[in-house]
Amino acid sequence: TMMPPKGGQLRSDMMAFLSKQSHKRMTDPEMGKLLDSLKSQNLSDEQAANVREVSRSYDKATKLPEELVEEKARHKSQAQQIWQEARAENDFKKFQPSLEKTVELTCKTAEYYGYEDNIYDALLDIYEPGMTVSQLDPLFAGLREAIVPLVKAVGESPNQPDTSFLDIGQFSEEKQREFSLKVAESIGFDFDAGRMDTSTHPFCSGA
């Protein structure tokens, strides 16, 4: 957030290096042996769940070559800075090559993970383990069938909410910051342990 623009290249190099080192640690054969040994232990439900999820991560990590992990991390960092510039200039074409490269690297990742019917199955499994496109499509089709007519009916209804309070104009960055600080303080945010800055896109993170 506070990094000067010319620090982008160094950041991308550092992110690539750290991702490479993390991948080496995660894919160490010793990690696999430790996970296998834990599966035969008398674990609590919570411990068993932890072992299961780490095993999933280990399995996926070992399918990816180190070079791809490094390239993805470097590109992600570089693309973020280009996106920030393109957003400020309202120029999508400036970001388009980076987005295309992101899709290309994501497809490579999916190929390494492997799939049976649809390339998206490999990516969907990251967030919804076991889910496939063939299972998901009927679900969304059913939702569309029910929701689209509902939204249309709501939009055409004579009983519309009063939204005039939304049409009061733009808010200055200073006023937005002032409001955000008050909200943070009201929920007990500790400014001795954290800070609030202005960024291209809102987010919250911690360490």
List each language-model region with its residue ranges.
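Contiguous, non-catalytic segments that form substrate-binding/exosite surfaces or channel walls
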Residues: 72-207
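A well-structured
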Residues: 1-129
